[in-house]
Amino acid sequence: MAKEKIRVRYAPSPTGHLHIGNARTALFNYLFARHNKGTMVLRIEDTDQKRNVKGGSKSQMENLHWLGIDWDEGPDKGGDYGPYRQSERKEIYQKYIDQLIDEGKAYYSYKTEEELEAQREEQRAMGVAPHYTYEYEGMTADEIKQAQDEAKAKGLKPVVRIHIPEMETYSWDDIVKGHLEFESDTIGGDFVIQKRDGMPTYNFAVVIDDHLMKITHVLRGDDHVSNTPKQLVVYEALGWEPPKFGHMTLIINSETGKKLSKRDESVLQFIEQYRDLGYLPEAMFNFITLLGWSPKGENEIFNKREFIKQFDPARLSKSPAAFDQKKLEWINNQYIKKADRDTLLDLALNNLQEAGLVDEHPTPEKMEWIRQLVNIYSIQMSYTKQIVDMAKIFFEEAKDLSDEEIEEIKNDDGRGVIEEFKKQLDLIPRFTSVQIMNAIQATRKATGVKGRKLFMPIRIATTRSMVGPGIGEAMELLGKKRVVEHIDLTLKQMSENNL
């Protein structure tokens, strides 16, 4: 027996930018397809016209490509099972709507929104979960036709609802969650499969598309579990075999323990935001893959090829995945340390230009200086935009020392170390990082001060910071004139504070 050809899909709605949760769904489907040498389909689910954002699908596709996720069939690539936009498949859906109506498995419903809300209010008052009740109960076929003709005459537009069989169990063996089942009376009554404007509902269109596109596995978020029994109703009504379903766990905020919500402003949640900050796509790919999936062993840094080789949906977690910002920053820092220097330079240059610190067209000499600046900060950066704050001293006039910095250098040796270091700088032949370090060592010999009491006063006096890159490299980039100005300003402030 031939092995089943794996076909998966990622089916976003063009309602805005690419969210972390949606990126994870796309990524896991991509890894599953590539691991099994299967096919990845991109389908745009744009039937909800009110929520669609202009350019939304283009933005999402660009960000998927940036992450390193590609697909084999889709609106931009074509394929044997298109169109790949739901808005272009209306005639296809209508064919199956008509079939279900002809077979008596679906029907036109003319109940108005006001009537439906009144029904729900009545059910709530009775302590019953709101659900749709069949509006033609006890009526003959002729009576139903008469009621529908009268509704048409009033100009009412119908929806189409699908019959839900009574006392039936809908179940599936979920790839992630194991065996799940729902009773038909918990679905909420006959549900809408076509809206008043003629567009299909999500739970109908997705079944038609997945079947006709020969999708074998559906990996999606936990929030779709409640949609699955409705989709199984449609599969059963059409006599089709459903695909295998896998529902990935929620992503939660590691700080609050609550579900990651688009309203949670404590966490950046869109891929574009991380791109703008200077995160690397390989790092984002790595981090997102670990949100609800675990590789074998202790290592957490893998390239795409290694992830594809290892990916097994059996290792998808049943517990919520914690979005840990600090872990993301650590992972991105690991990639920054290994990144191509030109790539880092381009990202950091863009950040510096957006901050107004560097001209749009820097000279070759300035570019070389910026390259060195990026190199000395790369080991510290969690993302390249951090260089804007880290390296402010290189672009702005020196400010007075903070109370914390003054506290650090007001020891008995602080002033003496700074004054001696200034003398030693005048003795070095060239203002290079090597010669600067020689001046620091000469200061140590002359003062007898070493360790933190030696290095911290020098760092604070010259770079106006208690942390930073190698002190020699930093001073070389600042240049001797500015370093001496900083030292003089520090000594002046110390005198004013009687230090």
UniProtKB/Swiss-Prot annotation:
Major localization listed first in the record, in broad terms: cytoplasm
SUPFAM superfamilies: An anticodon-binding domain of class I aminoacyl-tRNA synthetases, Nucleotidylyl transferase
Keywords per UniProt: Aminoacyl-tRNA synthetase, ATP-binding, Cytoplasm, Ligase, Nucleotide-binding, Protein biosynthesis
One of the protein's GO biological processes: glutamyl-tRNA aminoacylation
Residues binding ATP: 262
EC numbers on record: 6.1.1.17
InterPro entries, per the entry: aa-tRNA-synth_I_cd-bd, aa-tRNA-synth_I_codon-bd_sub2, aa-tRNA-synth_I_CS, aa_tRNA-synth_I_cd-bd_sf, Glu-tRNA-ligase_bac/mito, Glu/Gln-tRNA-synth, Glu/Gln-tRNA-synth_Ib_cat-dom, GluQ/Sye
Catalytic reaction(s) noted: tRNA(Glu) + L-glutamate + ATP = L-glutamyl-tRNA(Glu) + AMP + diphosphate
Chain positions of motif 'KMSKS' region: 259-263
Family: Belongs to the class-I aminoacyl-tRNA synthetase family. Glutamate--tRNA ligase type 1 subfamily.
GO cellular component, one term: cytosol
Gene3D superfamilies assigned to the protein according to its UniProt record, in alphabetical order: 1.10.10.350, HUPs
Known function: Catalyzes the attachment of glutamate to tRNA(Glu) in a two-step reaction: glutamate is first activated by ATP to form Glu-AMP and then transferred to the acceptor end of tRNA(Glu).
Domain of life: Bacteria
Descriptive protein name: Glutamate--tRNA ligase
Self-association state and partner proteins as the record states: Monomer.
One Gene Ontology term of the molecular function aspect: zinc ion binding
Transmembrane domains' residue ranges: none
Motif extent ('HIGH' region): 12-22
Compartment(s) where it occurs, according to its Swiss-Prot or TrEMBL record: Cytoplasm
Uppermost EC category: ligase
